[in-house]
């Protein structure tokens, strides 16, 4: 039995182009550099777009976006190159101290993330945190002017840092004021790239994972910005059981990709449809009407394979943090 289930795409334009934007700076120190991995790396991002890069090999802070290079004078790069050379040495010392207090040797990492977000409603957030070997170590709470320590070593550092009220207030001010000012400035510099919308392309395929069990995959790719909603529906109702989601990942070309899968018994004759919402367009794929923009391939006994061309967005993901031991780490002036 062959079922033809053409799909309908419903397009609803959003009334606002407001988005959440972020500015983040990441730093990574490595105890045993080698195999092409520098001892120290610092990278800046607006949303998911790389804007700056520094490493211990080049020892230069350099632009990673043309609109950054075109809008910031040479003395900006020279000034922050000097700051980052200082951070490079500080990270090396601090990582050695952490290894000593944890009684660790060999390969270990030390990380820092600082940044801010400008939300769709105009409100702001800020974050500053450290990690050791990819585990949370110290997290700054700008509202209470305090640090959250993740273990006994981190707690020793917390007490020292919290004794310096001036430094705590400085970090709060940087996160809430200076960081947001830089973010707005960078958004203006790169507005053509950062505020564009590229709709997702969507493709559905399948494979038999076990005898009598088929897995349907709905893949969205080539979209920007990264915020996207993608899900499977069974007979018109959203399903969560037997469903697996992939992360929203960069594709390497300034767009994003993601996927969702569902396991099914093709003998049951249920109707499955993939629903995608992205950016300024809301796309709903469901059955019972012809649409020239969709290629529908049908399998027997109610099993459908959809190959769809749509529009979409990607999403960013980052995370890695610290876990400490005895040692006092001094905060320096953040780079921009």
Swiss-Prot record:
Glycosylation sites: 103
Sequence ranges assigned to domain Ig-like C1-type in this UniProt record: 200-295
Region (Connecting peptide): 290-298
Source superkingdom: Eukaryota
Extracellular-facing ranges: 19-298
Ligand binding (8-(9H-purin-6-yl)-2-oxa-8-azabicyclo[3.3.1]nona-3,6-diene-4,6-dicarbaldehyde): 25, 27, 61, 76, 112
Paired cysteines (S-S): 116-179, 218-274
Region entry Alpha-3, spans: 198-289
Pfam families assigned: C1-set, MHC_I
GO biological process, one term: innate immune response
Antigen-binding cleft: annotated segments: 19-197
Residues noted as binding pyridoxal in the record, renumbered to the chain: 61
Signal peptide: 1-18
Positions of 5-(2-oxoethylideneamino)-6-(D-ribitylamino)uracil binding: 27, 42, 61, 112, 170-171
Record's keyword terms, sorted: Cell membrane, Disulfide bond, Endoplasmic reticulum, Endosome, Glycoprotein, Golgi apparatus, Immunity, Immunoglobulin domain, Innate immunity, Membrane, MHC I, Signal, Transmembrane, Transmembrane helix
Family: Belongs to the MHC class I family.
Assembly information from the UniProt record: Heterotrimer that consists of MR1, B2M and metabolite antigen. Major classes of metabolite ligands presented by MR1 include riboflavin-related antigens, pyrimidines and ribityl lumazines, nucleobase adducts and folate derivatives. Forms reversible covalent Schiff base complexes with microbial pyrimidine-based metabolite, which serves as a molecular switch triggering complete folding, stable association with B2M and translocation of the ternary complex from endoplasmic reticulum to the plasma membrane. Alternatively, forms non-Schiff base complexes with ribityl lumazines.
Name under which the protein is recorded: Major histocompatibility complex class I-related protein 1
Organism: Bos taurus (Bovine)
Gene designation: MR1
């Amino acid at each position: 039995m062959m079922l033809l289930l053409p799909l309908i795409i419903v397009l609803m334009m959003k009334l606002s182009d407001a988005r959440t934007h972020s500015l983040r700076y990441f730093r990574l120190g490595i105890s045993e550099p080698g195999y092409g991995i520098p001892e120290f790396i610092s990278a800046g991002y607006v949303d998911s777009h790389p804007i700056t890069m520094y490493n211990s090999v080049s020892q230069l802070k350099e632009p990673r976006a043309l609109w950054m290079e075109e809008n910031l004078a040479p003395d900006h790069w020279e000034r922050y190159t000097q700051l980052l050379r200082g951070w490079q040495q500080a990270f090396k010392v601090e990582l050695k101290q952490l290894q000593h207090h944890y009684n660790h040797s060999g390969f270990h990492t030390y990380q820092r993330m600082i940044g801010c977000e400008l939300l769709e409603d105009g409100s702001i957030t800020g974050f500053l945190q450290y990690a050791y070997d990819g585990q949370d170590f110290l997290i700054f709470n700008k509202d209470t002017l305090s640090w959250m320590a993740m273990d006994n070593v981190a707690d020793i550092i917390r007490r020292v840092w919290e004794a310096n009220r001036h430094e705590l207030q400085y970090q709060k001010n940087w996160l809430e004021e200076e960081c947001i000012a830089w973010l707005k400035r960078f958004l203006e510099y790169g507005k053509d790239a950062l505020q564009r919308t590229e709709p997702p392309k969507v493709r559905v395929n399948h494979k038999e994972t076990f005898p009598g069990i088929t897995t349907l995959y709905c893949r969205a790719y080539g979209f920007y910005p990264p915020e996207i909603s993608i899900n499977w529906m069974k007979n018109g109702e959203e399903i969560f059981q037997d469903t697996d989601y992939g992360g929203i990942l960069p594709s390497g070309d300034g767009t994003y990709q993601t996927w969702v899968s569902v396991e099914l018994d093709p003998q049951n004759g249920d109707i499955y449809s993939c629903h995608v919402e992205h950016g300024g367009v809301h796309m709903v794929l469901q059955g019972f009407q012809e649409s020239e923009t969709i290629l529908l391939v049908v399998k027997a006994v109610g099993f459908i394979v959809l190959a769809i061309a749509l529009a979409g967005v990607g999403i960013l993901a980052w995370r890695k943090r610290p876990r400490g031991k005895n040692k006092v780490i001094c905060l320096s002036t953040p780079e921009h």
